[in-house]
Amino acid sequence: NIYIFRKKELIHIRKGQVMEELIKEKVNKGLLSKEAALRISDTDKAYNCIGRDDYVKPLVSKEEIKLKKKDIIVMTTAGLQKNISVRELEDILVKRHRCRETAREIIETVKRKDNEGLDNLGLILIGI
């Protein structure tokens, strides 16, 4: 998932936009049927290009996102996302520490919970 943290609010950048572009490309090339494309749910399936042998080029969204000073780009893995609420993320991000300190606090908050999926905790924060 990708978010922009702006003015005390976490704005979810549509997680399906890259998946939709990939599906459209596969259908157009005849590598995926339209029926199969319709069955794919971007909430139930994760498509990870990192480390894939068949990864050829990055997908670029046609949707432009204008960043503002003091925005924070927040990228999370599914494992982290399942173990912390948006509200909890906002409460930590609003403190405005350095990104490294904020990332540590988010990871530690998740680790304190007794939840499943803690082996897949990934987080990237980019301050603008």
Description of each model-found segment:
Residues 14-67:
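Conserved, helical-rich catalytic subdomain that frames metal- and/or nucleotide-binding sites
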Residues 10-11, 44, 124:
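A broad, low-specificity signal marking well-ordered, structured residues that form hydrophobic/aromatic
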Residues 5, 38, 115-117:
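A generic structural signal for short, solvent-exposed coil/turn residues
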Residues 48-51, 55-76, 80-128:
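C-terminal catalytic subdomain
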Residues 1-7, 11-13:
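Conserved catalytic micro-motifs used in adenylation/nucleotidyl-transfer and phosphoryl/amide-
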Residues 4-6, 22-26, 85-86:
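A short, polar/proline- and glycine-enriched secondary-structure boundary/capping micro-motif
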Residues 8, 15-18, 89:
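Residue-level structural signal for beta-strand termini and adjacent loop
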Residues 1-2, 20, 81-82:
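Short, acidic Gly/Pro/Ser/Thr-rich loop/turn segments
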